[in-house]
Swiss-Prot record:
Similarity comment text for this entry: Belongs to the fluoride channel Fluc/FEX (TC 1.A.43) family.
Gene: fluC
UniProt keyword terms in alphabetical order: Cell inner membrane, Cell membrane, Ion channel, Ion transport, Membrane, Metal-binding, Plasmid, Sodium, Transmembrane, Transmembrane helix, Transport
Binding site residues for Na(+): G75, S78
Organism: Escherichia coli O45:K1 (strain S88 / ExPEC)
Transmembrane spans: 4-27, 32-55, 64-92, 96-121
Protein's UniProt name: Fluoride-specific ion channel FluC
NCBIfam families tied to this protein: crcB, PRK14196.1
Localization annotation: Cell inner membrane
Tagged with keyword Protein biosynthesis: no
A GO MF label: metal ion binding
Subunit (UniProt): Homodimer.
Ion transport keyword on record: yes
Taxonomic classification: Bacteria, Pseudomonadati, Pseudomonadota, Gammaproteobacteria, Enterobacterales
Notes on activation and inhibition: Na(+) is not transported, but it plays an essential structural role and its presence is essential for fluoride channel function.
Length: 126
């Protein structure tokens, strides 16, 4: 249990730090669809897709690494709550098209990046 906790703490602290750095760097560039939030969510999708494909090929890998990458790193890096509050703010301001665009770009983009990560590893290890 302690080992699992440390895996999540280590991965989460790296993920949270990356999220903060990327969001700080990019969000002011285009406030209607904050790119920092989008970048971290897309990056987390890519990482978890590559991790899933890799872990499927390494069934005996210590669960520590799986927890550190998926729950820790990707959980700390991605941010559904910030995405939600940004969409909510757009809706409150009457920017319905931007809100819908944000939802579509985040959800479809994250799915595409997850699939891309999965297929990159699948091709590399074929």
């Amino acid at each position: 249990m302690i080992k699992s906790l440390f895996a999540v703490i280590i991965g989460g602290s790296v993920g949270c730090t990356l999220r903060w750095l990327l969001s700080t760097r990019f969000n002011s560039l285009f406030p209607n669809l904050p790119p920092g939030t989008l970048v971290v969510n897309l990056l987390a999708g890519l990482i978890i897709g590559t991790a899933l494909a890799y872990f499927l090929r390494q069934p005996h890998l210590d669960p520590f690494w799986k927890l550190m990458i998926t729950t820790g790193l990707c959980g700390g890096l991605s941010t559904f709550s910030t995405f939600s509050v940004e969409v909510f703010a757009l809706l409150q301001a009457g920017n319905y098209i931007w809100a819908l665009t944000s939802v579509l770009v985040h959800v479809i983009g994250s799915l595409i990046m997850t699939a891309l990560g999965f297929f990159i590893i699948t091709i590399l290890f074929a």
